[in-house]
Amino acid sequence: MRVEEGRIPFRGHETWYRSVGDGPGVPLLVLHGGPGSTHLGLTPLEQLGDERRVVLYDQLGSGNSSKPSEPSLWTVELFLAELENVRQALGLEQVHLLGHSWGGMLAQEYALIRPEGLVSLVLSSSLSSAALWREESLRLRAALPSEIREPLDAHEAAGTTDDPEYERAILAFLHRHLCRLDPWPPLVEEVLRSTNLEVYRTMWGPSEAHPTGVLAGWDVTARLGEIHVPALVLCGRYDEATPLQAETIAQGLPDAELVIFEESAHMAPVEETDRYLATVRAFLARVDLRNP
């Protein structure tokens, strides 16, 4: 398969991208999570390059892209503009858009603009409401053993989330609701290690459970009916982006399918790679057939 890597100028910085495949299907553009994570956790999607072009990129501040240390930069508007810039630079006139976690939030925002040539959405382990995420996070927390739950609550209340005790407790939570493979594959370790905490904390906050940053009041649930492209909504049974959140998205969209991966948490592309890829592949093929 054809592989291409490059950098796209964007507002005085550069966005790094990787393009795999050049088959006849409508291209797939992939949006990673975080905010502040990288494309690495979604590299299994490159296997779909046997049927279509698959483009992954590191959002500004992340991975191989420019990393300006300017907290005022980190807004939804910036990342929407970057997405459109990537699409135009690479000539993606028609495109399927797959967003994972925060990337799914960005994908919903983009779809609400009703851009020309958007063929479908795949919303993977995502959310439509920061408030519902908070409620579901508290529910998941309540089910944790006290030796995990209490340090999480205490250090978040005290603002000491850099304390080693907190880090051990959050790691135990992540083994339940981020990735359930034991041990974690090196890919998962690298995704966590490479996260840009300035971007993450500015956009989301210091705690996974309690959004306090730019996205704290984010909610597009009431507007999902405005998105008229076919959509595939995905999550893991043990996902921190819980099945209730996935169901909320799927019910709000006019044309959506919902698939839950029974052995996965938040990283189904890594935890159940074969089933995840088969599910996405089949959906894209069905939509391509409907697309004139």
Regions found by a protein language model. Name each.
Residues 142-144, 150-229, 248:
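Alpha/beta-hydrolase
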Residues 1-14:
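N-terminal cap/lid segment of alpha/beta-hydrolase-fold proteins
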Residues 214-264:
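Conserved loop-alpha-helix segment in the C-terminal half of the alpha/beta-hydrolase fold
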Residues 35-36, 59-63, 103, 128, ...:
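Alpha/beta-hydrolase active-site loop signature
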Residues 255-292:
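Catalytic active-site module of serine/aspartate enzymes centered on a nucleophile-bearing elbow/loop
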